[in-house]
């Protein structure tokens, strides 16, 4: 049977890392962790699980960090996880079955269910949040995007959906959400600015309103209770902020 590695890029994940690794430690052949400068006891936790621990603080974005981490993988397959994710038993079986079958020219999408502010979000356009996370190590890799990086693979590749959820404990509080979304907004604006793009505040307003309507009404976010409403409002806010950030940068040129 082909071998499989878990690969992760992390920073200051002592709170979540053990819970994540507990769901994979008994059935993967290798755990690869690339740290970008943790100041908590992330490293000690990783090493206690037998992980191969590497460090790179020269941060050039999520995509390039994942590319570097993949270079350390020695197994036939790589499974990408974030520290705030957990592999369910059903998903574990689906992953092992895919690796055993070892189909050519295939990458695998995993359905992710996110818990936000204490509730699983099953609507709002968030579920099933299919993400490509499993593939042959020498077949594909992430692009070099600063943020919201995606796996790139050859034309003609079959994308197969696996069963079993990947649990994602994404936002633990509103403060946690705002801190993470601010980082994403900055990276988005950096990326757009580097391509010579500009934005207007009206674009920010219209995209924010569109975001709320889509999530809460069209994607039935109201079925996710108060958390669904809060998530739609915060997502609209984050959408506005990223356009406002890009707009504000252009003002300094005048």
UniProtKB/Swiss-Prot annotation:
Q: Which UniProt keywords apply?
A: Glycosyltransferase, Transferase
Keyword Transferase belongs to the record: yes
Q: Which InterPro entries match?
A: Glyco_trans_2-like (IPR001173), Nucleotide-diphossugar_trans (IPR029044)
Molecular function GO terms recorded: glycosyltransferase activity
The keyword Ribonucleoprotein is annotated on this UniProt entry: no
EC number(s) for this protein? 2.4.-.-
Q: Which family does it belong to?
A: Belongs to the glycosyltransferase 2 family. WaaE/KdtX subfamily.
Name this protein carries in UniProt:
Uncharacterized glycosyltransferase HI_0653
């Amino acid at each position: 049977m082909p071998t499989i590695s878990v690969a992760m890029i992390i920073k200051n994940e002592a709170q979540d890392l053990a819970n994540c690794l507990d769901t994979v430690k008994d059935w993967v052949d290798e755990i690869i962790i690339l740290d970008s400068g943790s100041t908590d006891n992330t490293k000690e936790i990783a090493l206690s699980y037998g992980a191969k621990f590497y460090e790179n603080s020269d941060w050039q974005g999520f995509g390039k960090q994942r590319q570097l981490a993949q270079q350390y993988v020695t197994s036939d397959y790589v499974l990408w996880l974030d520290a705030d994710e957990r592999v369910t038993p059903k998903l574990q079986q689906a992953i092992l079955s895919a690796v055993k079958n070892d189909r050519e020219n295939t990458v695998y999408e995993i359905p992710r269910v996110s818990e936000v502010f204490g509730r699983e979000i099953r609507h709002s356009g968030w579920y099933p949040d299919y993400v490509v996370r499993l593939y042959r190590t020498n077949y594909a890799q992430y692009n070099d995007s600063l943020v919201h990086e995606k796996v790139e693979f050859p034309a003609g590749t079959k994308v197969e959906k696996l069963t079993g959820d990947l649990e994602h404990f994404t936002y633990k509080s509103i403060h946690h959400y705002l801190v993470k979304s601010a980082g994403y907004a900055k990276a988005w604006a950096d990326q757009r600015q580097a391509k010579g793009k500009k934005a207007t505040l009206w674009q920010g307003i219209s995209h924010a309103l569109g975001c709320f309507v889509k999530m809460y009404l069209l994607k039935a976010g109201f079925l996710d209770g108060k958390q669904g409403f809060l998530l739609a409002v915060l997502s609209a806010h984050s959408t506005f902020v990223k356009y406002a950030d890009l707009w504000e940068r252009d003002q300094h040129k005048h």
